[in-house]
Amino acid sequence: MDKLMLDGNAVAGLLQEVFAAEMTSAIGSCATCGATEPVGAIHVYRGAGIVLRCPHCDNTLAAIVRDERRVWITFQGIRALELAWERA
């Protein structure tokens, strides 16, 4: 494993804050290769921002940049994201 790479669990807290849902079990499909994986299994790279990549083809699925007051998220490489829906 690349020393700079983490799995999707590394961004679980941030994603839960943004989406108000448990995101590591959400299923994403790659727009490039079509592979489907839970968010917890995707590859995460941290630098000036956070880049989420497909573990099969290395396509950029999403990028996250944040500061003290805002968060910017692009989903350029995700074809679909499936979340469990639990109504209260």
At which residue positions do the language-model features occur?
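A broadly conserved sequence feature marking short terminus-proximal activation segments
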Residues: M1-A26
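Basic nucleic-acid-binding interfaces
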Residues: A12-L14, R70, R87-A88
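Short cysteine-rich clusters marking metal-coordination/redox-active sites
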Residues: C30-C33, C54-C57
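Short, non-ligating residues that shape and space the ligands of small metal-coordination modules
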Residues: V39-G40, A63
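Short linker/helix segments within small regulatory modules
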Residues: I42-V51
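Short metal-binding segments enriched for Cys and/or His
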Residues: D58-W72, L83-A84
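Short, charged, intrinsically disordered terminal tails
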Residues: I78-A88
